[in-house]
């Protein structure tokens, strides 16, 4: 069943007296429960596409349809690279925030909050404020909140980009464990091919500006995956090199513009 349908989408921005063609003719279907990573050179329009899906930006032309199965659920939740937590709320209050806004029963909010705090290993830090947390802990709060909201789709914009390698691997595996349980439809932006290979059912590669989808690769490796398995698998190495070459050529084009 299709969860997200994008038809002939283009986006132009006006900057001073010039047009910037950020996205061009994007047509795409994402299935219910699919984990899709979006890769592409800097400035190719990845965040713009995510913002359109989050209804923070309107397409210039074309349509976006998110297939809503439950009207009581939010359509989407977003996780950003940084600053996604509310500084004056505790860890627990941050995770519960979306649920409280929907006026759900206190017992339900408490149970869901507790569940996701445990999933990301933050139960004993529940009373801390964001300024008392490390970068990795803050991202865990954002992930817990996004999943606790139980949205129709999850939009993640380089959520691990600011973390050190070790923390990144741990959070990637935690995210996969929660995703495998919930089977949310996820659209995840990354600059890392390794990250995309580890996480995705499918990788979409975008061209240099104006952003178009130039490659759509199914990643069929069995789950659960680990970075060690991904790096030692010959098929994954082949896909890595293929995407690497194409990405390099798109990055070079960006530099020539
Ligand atoms: N509100 C805006 N007004 C004008 N131009 C914009 C606006 N938002 C984005 N752009 C332009 O649209 C293009 C795509 O930007 P976007 O942030 O979507 O790219 P990106 O692929 O996410 O980049 P990065 O990988 O560096 O985060 C860029 O040229 C950017 O300058």
Where are the predicted features?
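Helix-to-loop junction immediately C-terminal to a conserved catalytic motif
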Residues: 54
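Catalytic Walker B motif of ABC-type/P-loop ATPase nucleotide-binding domains
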Residues: 154-157
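The feature captures the beta-strand-to-loop junction immediately N-terminal to the Walker
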Residues: 39-41
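Conserved ABC transporter NBD signature motif
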Residues: 62-72
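Short helical segment in ABC ATPase nucleotide-binding domains corresponding to the A-loop/adjacent helical element
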Residues: 92-100, 110, 114, 218
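Conserved signature/switch motifs of ABC ATPase nucleotide-binding domains
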Residues: 128-131, 149
């Amino acid at each position: 069943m299709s969860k997200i349908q994008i038809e002939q989408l283009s986006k132009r921005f006006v900057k001073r007296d010039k047009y910037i063609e950020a996205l061009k003719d994007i047509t795409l279907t994402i299935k219910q429960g699919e984990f899709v990573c979006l890769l592409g050179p800097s400035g190719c329009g990845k965040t713009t596409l995510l913002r359109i899906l989050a209804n923070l930006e309107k397409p210039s032309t074309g349509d976006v349809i998110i297939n809503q199965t439950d009207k009581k659920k939010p359509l989407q939740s977003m996780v950003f690279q940084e600053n996604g937590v509310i500084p004056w709320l505790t860890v627990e209050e941050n995770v519960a925030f979306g649920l409280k806004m929907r006026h759900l029963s206190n017992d339900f909010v408490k149970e869901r909050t507790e569940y996701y705090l445990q999933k990301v290993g933050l139960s004993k830090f529940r009373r801390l404020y964001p300024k008392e947390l490390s970068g990795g802990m803050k991202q865990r709060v954002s992930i817990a909140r996004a999943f606790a909201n139980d949205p129709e789709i999850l939009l993640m914009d380089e959520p691990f980009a600011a973390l050190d390698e070790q923390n990144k691997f741990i959070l990637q595996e935690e995210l996969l464990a929660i995703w495998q349980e919930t089977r949310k439809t996820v659209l995840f932006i990354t600059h890392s091919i390794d990250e995309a290979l580890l996480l995705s059912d499918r990788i979409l590669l975008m061209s240099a500006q104006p952003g178009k989808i130039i490659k759509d690769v199914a990643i069929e490796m069995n789950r659960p995956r680990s970075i060690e398995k991904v790096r030692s698998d010959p098929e994954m190495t082949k896909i890595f090199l293929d995407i690497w070459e194409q990405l390099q050529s798109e990055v070079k084009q960006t530099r020539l513009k």
